């Protein structure tokens, strides 16, 4: 039997845990080794590789791509200017009429391929200005070298390709619904208890955002080692747990937290498992919640898992939804809390069915262990009745011109109750007797 600590959490007996196949945060605990041509396969799907990689690596990759393209075309422009002779220092020709001049016209300087490029730094700056379309207007390509014109066109195309790829990758990485799963919540424990006379496995899911998950549906699989009849060992044999596929109960309207129910019947892998077997079993139940994000219409998936040690036998979840005057309130402080249910059978569902045991309602427990749903319902009903009586007393007091204090309201309430009893007696005196009773009296 599991006890409770001060925080309301159930104590789980310690025993050796198996390695999780799916972690509680949804990550798969799988490592791939000895993959042939891994780099080539990942580079063949470079877009998915960039989307799946971390932000820092992606930004480093695109920064390196820009820098390499600038350096490459800067070197290309420098080579064009070098072989055209634009980098050679032109001799200083004295102006006409200057001392030592011949008074004649100065020889015309050859027209360069790229204006104002006198070294590699100038060529690199021209490459950056061309690819980023800054357009300072100081350096430009002339008609002297067609090769330089072709290089400018090619660099413009390459720059557009890099920009488009970077923007598309960043947008796809930001819009993917992977982070939406962080606001979908699974309970820390699953429970097994009786519901409608049958043993059921239950866990709770919740949505922390007000935006809905469209077409939300759940799935569950039990994973455990399995030995076939031929002696083949399957370390991770997967078997489905029916959560209402046939009748549509797997599709949920996830506005408030919902308890997912798996009925342990003949087709369930848990059919022959009782409380003692559960404590010694080695399995993992993977639960999956899928749906479309309302804002982007993209499919998201949230995952979690429960080991055998995280399933509480004979427990139920505390309620989290409370009806108030104008709305419903969801208290997420109770989301993971459970309470023990007296009278839950410890046998398996098979034994329960074979022995034809009828699960009778347990005798009323003490106030401290009273069912939370019934207690809250009674408290809510009593509060509503008290509010109605107080409103009626205030109305009567206002009609009589009295100040309705606490004592006056109590007296008026007693008067109303006494008056209702008198009215009931008067009505009973004026009502005619039943004809059937007349005939029976005459027969007597």
UniProtKB/Swiss-Prot annotation:
Q: What is the lineage of its organism?
A: Eukaryota, Metazoa, Chordata, Craniata, Vertebrata
Question: Which Gene Ontology cellular-component terms appear in the entry?
Answer: cytoplasmic vesicle membrane; monoatomic ion channel complex; postsynaptic membrane
Which positions does the site annotation Role in the control of polyamine-mediated channel gating and in the blocking by intracellular magnesium cover? Answer: 163
Provide the species name: Mesocricetus auratus (Golden hamster)
Catalytic activity annotation: K(+)(in) = K(+)(out)
TM stretches of this protein: 56-80, 148-169
Q: In which compartments does the protein localize? A: Cell membrane; Postsynaptic cell membrane; Cytoplasmic vesicle membrane
Q: Which family, according to UniProt?
A: Belongs to the inward rectifier-type potassium channel (TC 1.A.2.1) family. KCNJ4 subfamily.
**Protein's recorded name:** Inward rectifier potassium channel 4
Protein keywords: Cell membrane, Cytoplasmic vesicle, Ion channel, Ion transport, Membrane, Postsynaptic cell membrane, Potassium, Potassium transport, Synapse, Transmembrane, Transmembrane helix, Transport, Voltage-gated channel
Q: Which residues lie on this side of the membrane: Cytoplasmic?
A: 1-55, 170-444
GO BP terms in the entry: potassium ion import across plasma membrane; regulation of monoatomic ion transmembrane transport
Parts of the chain on the Extracellular side: 81-119, 139-147
Source organism, top-level taxon: Eukaryota
Q: Which InterPro entries does the entry link to?
A: Ig_E-set, IRK_C, K_chnl_inward-rec_Kir, K_chnl_inward-rec_Kir2.3, K_chnl_inward-rec_Kir_cyto, Kir_TM
Give the residue ranges of motif Selectivity filter.
133-138
| UniProt intramembrane stretches | 120-131, 132-138
